[in-house]
A protein has these predicted regions:
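Mixed-charge, Lys/Arg-rich low-complexity intrinsically disordered regions
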Residues: 1-13
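A structural detector for beta-sheet-dominated domains
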Residues: 5, 21, 30, 43-45, ...
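Active-site-proximal loop/hinge segments that shape catalytic or ion-binding/gating pockets
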Residues: 65-272
Length: 272
């Protein structure tokens, strides 16, 4: 694992993303110049690297913090590549899709603070993390998803697949190797480091036949803080209400996949 550093060669930052927030890539760092007033001037190009934008001036401490975040993101990207992780997934009711395509996926707290109407997938958040959104790596938590569908047989459901770059950009994502509401975690537990991401693929009890992109425990989850912007959505998968969902995804510019295997269970279900 990486060691965060206390000294940097500031020119090593050239070519990396600059983040206007902790999860939105804003620009590419084009040049860094040390200024006479002990500030560092970062010149930026737009995200497509086609034109110059304004510069920002940072103190050395701010520059160091920026560099360490970039190191974490680089390592996280390497983990996703090594595990061949192509998507994270989130299931919801079809009736929520129109709002989700417009506003992104929002936490319960964000939704309650807004005027957005929604139908919750989980009435009882036992993890009590109402500022977080539950997702899974590569395949839904099929035990929970199945139980929700059985409890609500008249409700149409959808699985949204999401670009895993989201967890590279959002450094406050939390990684749980089993269900966050399992009772083994304290309320103030905050597993945001890359070590916790790796722990989701622990060897003990792992079925050797599941894809390496699957976490060991099918109830493992990633909690995303407050919002998942719709720019990260890759596709939507459903089994019912196909014409409605097709129309919504076409308008939103998102791929649609009917009769998805993501409504099934993992091949290692007998172990769990």
């Amino acid at each position: 694992m990486i060691n965060l550093i206390k000294n940097i060669n500031y020119r090593d930052l050239i070519g990396y993303y600059y983040y206007i927030s902790d999860y939105i890539p804003y620009a590419i760092i084009d040049n860094v110049i040390k200024m006479p007033n002990n500030y560092y001037r970062i010149y930026l190009k737009d995200i497509k690297n086609t034109k110059y934008l304004n510069y920002v001036d940072l103190t050395y401490e701010e520059l160091l913090s920026l560099n360490n975040k970039l190191l974490i993101r680089k390592e996280r990207s390497e983990i996703l590549k090594e595990r061949n992780i192509k998507k994270i997934v989130h299931f919801t009711k079809v009736e929520n899709l129109e709002s989700i395509f417009e506003n992104g996926i929002l936490s319960v707290n964000r939704l309650n603070d807004s005027s957005i109407a929604y139908s919750p997938s989980d009435l009882f958040r036992l993890d009590d993390k109402l500022n977080m959104i539950s997702t899974s790596i590569s395949f839904p938590n099929y035990k929970m998803f199945y139980s929700k569908r059985m409890e609500n047989p008249d409700i149409d459901w959808a699985v949204i697949t999401i670009d895993p770059k989201l967890i590279i950009h959002k450094l406050d994502s939390e990684f749980y190797k089993t269900n966050a509401a399992s009772g083994i975690y304290s309320f103030d537990y905050s597993p945001t480091s890359n070590n916790f991401l790796l722990d989701m693929f622990y060897d003990e009890g792992r079925d050797p036949n599941i894809p390496k992109s699957y976490p060991t425990d099918p109830q493992a989850e990633i909690l995303i803080n407050n919002k998942m912007p719709n720019t990260y959505f890759n596709s939507v998968e459903t089994r019912k209400n196909i014409s409605k969902v097709k129309s919504l995804t076409r308008t939103a510019g998102i791929d649609y996949n009917p009769n998805s295997h993501l409504f099934s269970y993992r091949s290692d279900y007998k172990r769990w």
